[in-house]
Amino acid sequence: MTNFFNRSPKHQSHHYQPHQQDVTDISYSMENVSISSNAMMDIDTSYRSSKPTYNNPQQQQQQQQQQQAQNNLFNKENITPLNSPTKSILHNSPQQAKSSTSPQHLYNKLVNANYNGNSPQPGIQQQQNNRALQNNINQLQPPLNKRYKLTEAEFYAKANSARTKRLTSIAQLYFLDYYCDMFDYVINRRERTAIVEKNLLTDPMYKNDITKQQFEWKNYIGRERALLRKRRLKPKHKDFEMITQIGQGGYGQVFLSRKRDTREICALKILNKKLLIKLDETRHVLTERDILTNTRSDWLVKLLYAFQDQEKVFLAMEFVPGGDFRTLLNNTGYLIPPHARFYISEMFAAVNSLHELGFTHRDLKPENFLIDSKGHIKLTDFGLAAGTVCNDRIESMKIKLQNLQNLNDFNDDSNNDNHHYQVPSSLIYERQKIFKQSQQQQQQQNSNNTTANSIVGSPDYMALEVLEGKNYNYTIDYWSLGCMLFEALCGYPPFSGSKQDETYYNLKHWKTALRRPQTKDGRYVFSDRTWNLIIKLIASPNNRLQNFKQVQQQSYFSDIKDWGNLRQKTPPFTPQLDNEEDAGYFDDFEDDEMMMKYKDVFARQEQNEQLLEKSNTTTTTTTTTTTKNGKRFSPGSKFNDNFIGFTFKHKSNPNNKFTNGSGNTGRYGNGNGNNNNNGEINLLNMVENGNGIGNGNSRSSRLNPLATLY
């Protein structure tokens, strides 16, 4: 493989530094600029005449030295990077002596060449020539704001920018993936061809019948051709059949979908491209896409397809049918210690898989952990449809935290009992009651409000250093997991208050607010090893557990002998599913009562759409193609530039598989239908509506089996 990406021999002979070599190659590859005959008629080409005569050798030597100096200057000035806004075209103009002023632009040189200075008002022929010249210049010139050449410092700053590095990585991965996939396809095709030829020559059914051999060979070639065409197709929105909505966010929706040709079930996220760009959320979408395409872990939700059109971006992800961990907690109230240990251990393993990819979540919540069909945990939502971890949200929460400094004054007012702040109670039943009341009040506020609430959210699980704007590392996710373990065992987060302001104040004074829960008779709810783990997770950055190995060594996890075998253990809860389209563990978006808790989300979405519509009215955009720098482009293409390298198709896509006309595999297996155990698809006789598929419309509420244990 490496031989396909080596430099050519002509480049290997140079011994420049890497960046100098690239710049030199680019400068040598610049094309000459061609000008029409009408323009060339008026350009002074006297400098191309025969060599001048010199009166004496000294004058000739002096002229040659000046010429050599000018040539050196010319060579230095015209080494321009390929992605510079302008390409040097001075080598088509006369070389003049070096002046103290900046070099004259080619446009001015050509215009000056058209006027001889004697006729200030040119005639009709001259005007026609000038118009022809101007048309050529318009094609040669860059935009007005980019008429300069990048300096060396600007060029290398641009080359080392995060955007350039990402595009470079995308290009490298694209070509490596393309050639590896192509070689894999060619090798498999040769193997299939050899098997077909062998069967046609040895099978008694075809051995002595030339007509049947030709017929079967023609069918085989047709299936290979169909497979090759399928491989070239890019996914589109119309390729997916929408079954039901399972999620809603400020930037788009999530639908349970089925891909029409491969019959794959997926969760399809549909996001408004213009809104993402307007609210500066493009980076979060690309981060989500990069994480999902790089992961091979069973702990992270997998990406199946990523594609876009002029208005939307689409992420077709693995459908995890068991609902989220928040739903599990709502159904049970709290978990018994063995069950809590099972789930928190899997959460640590999932978060560690994310950290190994070089990413930090920053805003882990029970809603981010899904339960798959076998009852195990998968991590999702890395900052996408629900606007998770957007910088605006963190900044607004930071301001909210700073504004609560005024609450300190209440402690000095002994005559004002209403404003006097008290440390949260350690009694578990009191805190559970307060937490339930605060949730009910929040739902009531959402149902009464007709406009979107502030972007500020509750910081129940977010580490303090994130809100304070301080430097942080991936251990902030350990803080969040500590808060979730606390809630799983007690039924409320450690810093929850009766009002949101109290929650912020508890977080700001977390060392005082974090108290070990007790029952009425004074017994501690947590065991010693459980409490020791929590205070090592919810701790200052220097005292917090620093890596996954330290987490595994805690006495709380002493019963776990093999962390690599977690997914083979029997979970305490397994979703009861009717079929692969069963979305019963997700909210029913056709139920008006259930949608009351999404009222804030819908209002925020409406507010975003109004903001986008307002910006569209102030900006004149056309749907027709226009001309820019001599090139035709569509106005919508500027949005695609923000999502370069977004398209993705997973390797196990059934369109990359091969089957014969009867449903058998390309290796003449024993399949007998359109879908076989290997997930391979019959490309010729595909049935649009598969058999044995349920309607998937059962959205009745489910009784969590764990609820009977508490």
UniProtKB/Swiss-Prot annotation:
It is an enzyme of class 2 (transferase). It is found in: Cytoplasm, Cytoskeleton, Microtubule organizing center, Spindle pole body; Cytoplasm, Cytoskeleton, Spindle; Nucleus; Bud neck. Residues 240-557 form the Protein kinase domain. Its EC number is 2.7.11.1. GO terms for biological process: cell division; hyphal growth; intracellular signal transduction; mitotic spindle organization; regulation of exit from mitosis. Residues 58-70, 617-627 have a biased composition (Low complexity). It catalyses: L-seryl-[protein] + ATP = O-phospho-L-seryl-[protein] + ADP + H(+); L-threonyl-[protein] + ATP = O-phospho-L-threonyl-[protein] + ADP + H(+). Its main location: cytoplasm. It holds the Pfam family Pkinase. The keyword Ribonucleoprotein does not apply. The active site is at 363 (proton acceptor). Residues 559-658 form the AGC-kinase C-terminal domain. Disruption phenotype: Leads to inviable cells. SMART domains: S_TK_X, S_TKc. One of its GO terms (molecular function) is ATP binding. Residues 663-672 have a biased composition (Gly residues). One of its GO terms (cellular component) is spindle. ATP binds at residues 246-254, 269, 696-703. Induction: Cell cycle-regulated with a peak during M/G1. The keyword Iron does not apply. Residues 46-57, 71-103 have a biased composition (Polar residues). InterPro entries: AGC-kinase_C, Kinase-like_dom_sf, Prot_kinase_dom, Protein_kinase_ATP_BS, Ser/Thr_kinase_AS, Ser_Thr_kinase_AGC. Belongs to the protein kinase superfamily. Ser/Thr protein kinase family. This is Cell cycle protein kinase DBF2. It comes from Candida albicans (strain SC5314 / ATCC MYA-2876) (Yeast). The lineage of its organism: Eukaryota, Fungi, Dikarya, Ascomycota, Saccharomycotina.
